[in-house]
């Protein structure tokens, strides 16, 4: 069996660059492993209209970038709000290509529901107001983003994260999703961020229950943006799911 590649999908107000520290760790620990961080439509290098956003368009973007990288079998990794689009990408790729799905501090709506249906804490009123906006949403104020995404980061990590926040579609929290076509045989891992202020552990466990089929839960004592705060630990987790036995160091 050939070694799968790793496809990394960002969440809201982020783009592919947020994965750079983890991609670097993967390359250092496992030379030759193919890993690609994708941009969803309207972010980074991927053209698109943030006001014409759809789950289907995101899934198509993920598949196209995986194909462009020459990846056949893959481990799909999604952070935060990409929990709503990762199953659609897996459905398009099919069980014959998706070795495993990994959800990192993700938000998974109820079947047929929206992310707004799941939100509590500081994000619900923000998302509800944002959904009524006539244009893209500016990145959150840095003081707010630092508190919700970056608590516990070093100064350098926090600067890296905040400098790479991007505008977001107001549709993100109100798009209904369906996982009816997700192949049930694809195994799923959940990376649970214990100090997460954006999606607290209880909210993540509720998302796990809505998703169903999670057979592997790994806890990290870190904040929401684990790919920046704990890239070495996250790389180790991903390599174990790929099948590479590479330890820390």
Please place each PLM-identified region on the residue numbering.
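Active-site loop/oxyanion-hole signature of alpha/beta-hydrolase fold enzymes
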Residues: 34, 40-75, 89-92, 116-120
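Gly/Ala-rich beta-loop-alpha elbow adjacent to hydrolase catalytic centers
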Residues: 77-82, 86
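Conserved HGGG/HGGXW glycine-rich cap/lid loop of the alpha/beta-hydrolase fold
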Residues: 2-47
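Flexible "cap/lid" loop of the alpha/beta hydrolase fold
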Residues: 91-92, 96-135, 141, 172-173, ...
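Conserved loop-alpha-helix segment in the C-terminal half of the alpha/beta-hydrolase fold
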Residues: 194-221, 228, 240-242
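Active-site nucleophile elbow and catalytic-triad environment of alpha/beta-hydrolase enzymes
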Residues: 163-181, 186
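The conserved beta1-alpha1 loop
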Residues: 7-11, 79, 192
């Amino acid at each position: 069996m050939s070694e799968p590649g790793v496809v990394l999908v960002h969440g809201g107000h982020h783009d592919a660059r947020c994965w750079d520290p983890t991609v670097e760790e993967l390359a250092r620990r496992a030379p030759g492993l193919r890993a690609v961080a994708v941009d969803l439509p309207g972010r980074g290098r991927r053209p698109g209209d943030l006001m014409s956003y759809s789950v289907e368009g995101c899934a198509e973007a993920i598949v196209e970038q995986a194909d462009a990288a020459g990846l056949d079998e893959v481990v799909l990794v999604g952070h935060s709000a990409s929990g709503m689009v990762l199953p659609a990408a897996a459905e398009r790729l099919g069980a014959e290509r998706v070795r495993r799905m990994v959800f990192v501090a993700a938000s998974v709506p109820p079947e047929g529901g929206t992310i707004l249906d799941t939100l509590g804490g500081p994000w619900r009123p923000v998302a509800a107001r944002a959904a009524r906006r006539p244009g893209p949403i500016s990145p959150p104020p840095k003081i707010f983003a630092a508190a919700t995404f970056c608590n516990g980061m070093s100064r350098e990590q926090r600067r890296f994260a905040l400098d790479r926040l991007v505008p977001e579609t107001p549709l993100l929290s109100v798009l209904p999703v369906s996982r009816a076509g997700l192949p049930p045989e694809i195994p799923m891992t959940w990376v649970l961020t214990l100090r997460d202020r954006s999606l607290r552990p209880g909210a993540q466990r509720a998302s796990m229950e809505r998703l169903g089929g999670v057979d592997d839960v790994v806890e990290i004592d870190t904040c929401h943006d684990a790919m920046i705060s704990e890239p070495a630990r996250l790389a180790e987790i991903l390599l174990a799911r790929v099948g590479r036995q590479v330890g820390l160091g």
